[in-house]
Amino acid sequence: MAENKQNDLLWKNISSLPYFRGFLRAVEGRYYRDISLTSPLLDLGIGDGHFSATTFPGAVDFGIDPSYKSLQEAFSHQAASTLCCAKGHRLPFPDAYFSTVVSNSVLEHIPDLKEVLIEVRRVLKRDGDFIICVPNDQFTQNLSVARLLNALHLRSLAVWYQRLFNKISRHYHPDSVQEWQRNLSEAGFQIVKTWNYFPPKSLAILEWGHLFGIPAWLNKQLFGRWILFPKMWNLWPVYKWLDSHYRMDQTAQDGAYSFFIMKNA
């Protein structure tokens, strides 16, 4: 393998998640290796805790999520020192408490986005860091089936497919980069750095993985885990296939996701 198992983000993700989701999380996790995270740190929307536990183990001081069931999984992963069941628009923390807030693939799922952004700014220290990953409007534009339908001039079917995929993904905000920048700036954040990632070829892996990942979904429903046999002998073919993509630079202008590093101005 390119790295030993302890440090290999791709292996750690695909050995415990559906391969398509694990691939995306490994790409995102790799970006965090070059980012300094200052304590106290809040993970906004920690979910099942897998991303935090895998990407920055032991670094998260508080993790919040509205789902108690997800927090039970986060507890089993030891994803944060303290876990709280709460919603993002009403955070149970004092003003200017955190030095860093991270939110990975969460904000797009929140209808009342502006309220949450205002609340994040309240609990973040002056000049504190706010780091997020979100899909942009190229997520639907780059879907392979939609592009094929558009090429065949079946535009209404393409739009239907794009809307269906957004619904499956539970996206309330598949917004353009410009819209994200405007909403973040209006909430009082200074964007220090941003880039797009996950080009069309990588998105196709995610897209088709929703179909081919059905066995993993059944495993989760029946046995409580995505991967029944997380061993290299079992996952070697998919690991080698994904590793060839993972080794490539995933930063791309036409990327379906956007990474933002911000300061509380």
Predicted feature locations:
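Helix-to-beta-strand junctions that scaffold the AdoMet/dcAdoMet cofactor pocket
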Residues: I110-P111, L124-R126
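S-adenosyl-L-methionine-dependent methyltransferase catalytic module, highlighting the catalytic core
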Residues: K114-E119, D129-F260
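Conserved functional loop/turn residues at catalytic and ligand-binding sites
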Residues: P92, Y97, H109, G188
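Active-site micro-motifs of SAM-dependent methyltransferase domains
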Residues: R90, E108, F139
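A short SAM/SAH-binding and catalytic strip from SAM-dependent methyltransferases
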Residues: V102-P111
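C-terminal beta-strand of the catalytic ATP-binding
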Residues: M262-A265
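Residue-level "edge-of-site" marker
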Residues: K87, V106, Y197-F198
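Conserved N-terminal segment of class I S-adenosyl-L-methionine
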Residues: M1-R90, P94, T100-V102, L117, ...
